[in-house]
């Protein structure tokens, strides 16, 4: 049985960005909703393990990698939402630049998120340099790893509203894309 690490971004100590409506941080939002992805993956026949970097003893991305590695996952997916200047919005997925399987999974999940949220498709973001977001998470995971940024929920009102309104469908779509990734087989 294939195992998927569903890593909640940030930590209880550092919640990450806060939604424009101030209801949730990244950590609290995904803590409330990640179970929907887990349930759908399990319904599809996968083992899904919800985890967080704080369980590996820290709050930085390297601890997220350590926790995903400890789970023994075949795929690691870390859940976030974005923030930037108020004019920027959309959906993007980050992956390790040298991982063909990571890129394949990223393509499938990015397409699924865009289909549900109907926000601008900001595309895939290959992570290669130490200055890139999540560098140590990607560098240190031993399996294909992704970081999902489905919306600019901390800086764009439309993105925030859309993420909240469609989170259930989004969770099902992400699980479906993961299923498609495994069914198509690794590169």
Q: What annotation goes with each model-predicted range?
A:
Residues 2-91, 95-101:
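Catalytic-core regions of hydrolytic enzymes
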